UniProtKB/Swiss-Prot annotation:
This protein's GO CC annotations: nuclear pore central transport channel
Listed name of the protein: Nuclear pore complex protein nup54
Main location: nucleus
Start and end residues of each stretch annotated as Disordered: 1-188
Sequence repeat positions: 4-5, 15-16, 30-31, 40-41, 54-55, 71-72, 85-86, 98-99, 109-110, 171-172, 183-184
Organism expressing this protein natively: Dictyostelium discoideum
Chain positions covered by the region annotation 11 X 2 AA repeats of F-G: 4-184
Note on domains (UniProt): Contains FG repeats.
Amino acid sequence: MSLFGNTTTGGGGLFGNTTTPTQTTGGGLFGNTTTGGGLFGNTATPTTGGGGLFGNTATPTLTTGGGGGLFGNTTAPTTGGGGLFGNTPTQTTGGGLFGNTATGGGGLFGNTQQQQQQQQQQQQQQQQQQQQQPSTSLFSQSSLGSQSSLGSQSSLGSQSSLGSQSSLGSFGQTQQPQTSSLFGNLQQQQQLQQPQRSIIEQKLYDFMQSISPNSLNCRFLYWFYNYQANGQLVDPNSIPKPPNVTVDQWAYALSNNPDPSILIPVAAKSFDDLINRRMKQEETIIALDQNTQEALKRMRDLENHLNFHIHTQLEMMRKKQIELIQRYIEVWSNLEIYQSKGKTFTTSEERIMKKIYELFEEINQPNSIKSKVEEISNQLKLGSMEKEKIKYEISPEAVEPLYNLLKNMTISIERITNELEIAVKDAQILKNELYQLKKC
């Protein structure tokens, strides 16, 4: 085998071995090799063919059986011949670099096909042989389905990846006239995935809109009603609609307003709105509590002020009244003395005189009412001190009637004391008058 020549006998080389002697005709730089299986494939019978720089013509020869090469095998009769720019084979099947084809072998840039009917018959034979005797390649599997090509569609009568009509497949074997490609399948898958993605994206968008407080389609919506500040009346038509609610929702809120004259609808569409509303209510409650405490403080101050001034004024009025009574008694006594001057005592006057003396003696006696009152008060004080020592537990139901009793007793004692003081004063006045009468 020479660089530009032909080989006359079969031998083992880098690209294959032959099992029987072969004869070749013609050979150039890109000519023919004899036959044989090697790195790229094996054949069981001799083949003939020749190749020149720009192509050759070959006579049909038959091969039997199929062998597996690194990238493919031949399964049908072939006539090998290929030039640099092409040749005219007749019904051949040959192994390409990346796969097997059902029709003639190819040159580097393309081949011409002949006899479409015979090609179809050979294709059917190849399909049957592939079913019975499948061949394998490094980058593809043999099947009855469609095969893929690197960036192009490979089939009978279709364009290859190099832009020429050939039966060379890439990474696979073609047995049926179906057109498919690696990128075509990806495009089909992407086209199928695009509707699915759009549906999922639409569902996600709808879900986000249903929970977004700024969306009109938010499902979380509840209406609260706030009081108008400063107690002013509200005009429902002058209330602006919030931007994140629809017209129907706003109309529903206005229609369900319990008192449109003082209440304003407020929409709550999220937990943040509820939290803000709760914080505002707490602030309002704190402000109301502060106002209440201030009002109570002012009321206490006013009560203390009134009690102090009224009590002092009442005491002053009582003192004035007592002075007036004393003056009146003094005037009346002087008048009576002047009128009764030189007259004798009557029986009634004598009785009054006796009563006055008796009252005066009772007051000064140790068993008088005054002493009894002091004794009772001392006993109460001692009883309270003993209670503090013993620490008896008295129920509120028992304390209340005792308190009322003591209160009534204290009031009665004060009244008796006042009456006694008045009686003592009257007795003193009478005593003075009697003393003056005696002088006269």
